[in-house]
Structures are given as C-alpha cells and as structure tokens.
C-alpha cells in the first residue's frame, strides 16, 4: 500500500480493478481497529488536511481565503495521543467544544490528564472529570518543565501529512479511509511485517464474517 498502484500491478498478477477493491477493503478494516479508551497522560489537538494554496484551482481560490489553522476551509481532523504511543484520529465538522469534548469523553477515561493548547474548544474539560494542562503556543511555548506538551501528537500530524502528500491527491470521500490507514500504521509501527499481515488477516476475516 506504500507503493503506487502501477508498481504493485507490475509485481502481482491481478487486474487493476480487483487490486483497487482489495486496497479499499484493507483501508476499511484498518479504520475499524479503534484503540481502547486511553488513560494516564494524553495529548489532544486538531490539524487540517488539504493541498497547498498555490495548487488550488482558480474557482476554489475565488470562494475561499488563504488561511492557516483554525478558520481555514480545509478539512479539520481531531486527534488524541496517549503517551504510551497509541493515537486516535477522526475527521470532524468543526473545532468547537461541542465537536471536541464528546470525543475526548468517549476515547479518554475519566481522571486522565489532558494536555492541549489554549484553544477555546477545550475550555471546561476539567469540569468533566479530567486534569487539564495547557501549553500556550501563542507565546511560543511547546513544553514546560513538568512535561506538559503536545509534541507527540504534532509528530503524528507531520507523519500523516507527509504520507498524504505522497499520494498526490485524495478524494474527500475517501479521506477517512486514508486517515484510518495511517492511524493503523502508526499504532502498529513496532510490529514486523509478518505480525502486521497476521493482524490484517484477522481484521479482514472479522469484517467479512460481520457482513454475512
């Protein structure tokens, strides 16, 4: 899956249509492998996916402004990273408290420590049973002496964007599948290829069984 369709086709005897269907199936089952609820110290943050402004088509340029970060018209993604190394991420519609905090409550156990920047979408999360630690990026603060930071999650965002960029363009309707793929790859990066293959085979079997 890290190679182009053309390269894979040159190595296996299968039609392009069947290959594309199989790759789609792999990405579908990867999206079902949701990590168990995190606990301990976790990092939360959002990012935005989309091509560079210079590559936008003219009609897109005319209807939207060139912005970075919150307020941009790009696709927002919300992520949660546990300091153990596991990450969870999901495409979201907005970045306000009503978009972010229900997802935190679902994916992070009460009593855990939430590390975030000072975005208003996280205001009030401490009242919901969490310890909340802030990192003020506006003051160029990326960590404090107590280990409160979101550097791990920002590292994942960098990994995700490099992988997405290497694909050369992804349809919005399929964006969630590629997000699921790279979350899965990141969470299982320490496994051997054989171990990853065995896990995927189990996921495929489970998916096919549930469909029947």
Each model region followed by its residue ranges:
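Residue-level recognition of single "structural anchor" positions
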Residues: 1-212
């Amino acid at each position: 899956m890290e190679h182009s369709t053309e390269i894979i086709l040159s190595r296996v005897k299968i039609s392009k249509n069947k290959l594309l269907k199989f790759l789609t199936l792999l990405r579908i089952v990867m999206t079902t492998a949701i990590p168990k609820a995190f606990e301990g110290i976790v990092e939360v943050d959002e990012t935005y996916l989309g091509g560079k402004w210079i590559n936008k088509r003219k009609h897109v340029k005319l209807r939207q402004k060139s912005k970075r970060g919150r307020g941009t018209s790009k696709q927002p993604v919300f992520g949660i990273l546990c300091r153990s190394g596991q990450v969870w991420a999901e495409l979201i519609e907005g970045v306000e408290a009503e978009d972010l905090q229900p997802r935190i409550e679902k994916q992070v156990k009460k009593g855990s420590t939430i590390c975030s920047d000072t975005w208003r979408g996280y205001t009030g999360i401490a009242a919901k049973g969490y310890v909340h630690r802030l990192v003020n990026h506006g003051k160029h603060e990326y960590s404090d002496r107590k280990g409160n930071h979101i550097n791990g999650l920002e590292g994942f965002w960098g990994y995700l964007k490099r992988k997405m960029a290497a694909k050369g363009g992804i349809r919005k309707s399929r964006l969630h599948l590629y997000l699921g793929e790279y979350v899965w790859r990141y969470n299982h990066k320490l496994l051997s290829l054989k171990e990853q293959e065995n896990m995927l085979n189990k996921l495929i079997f489970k998916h096919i069984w549930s469909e029947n």
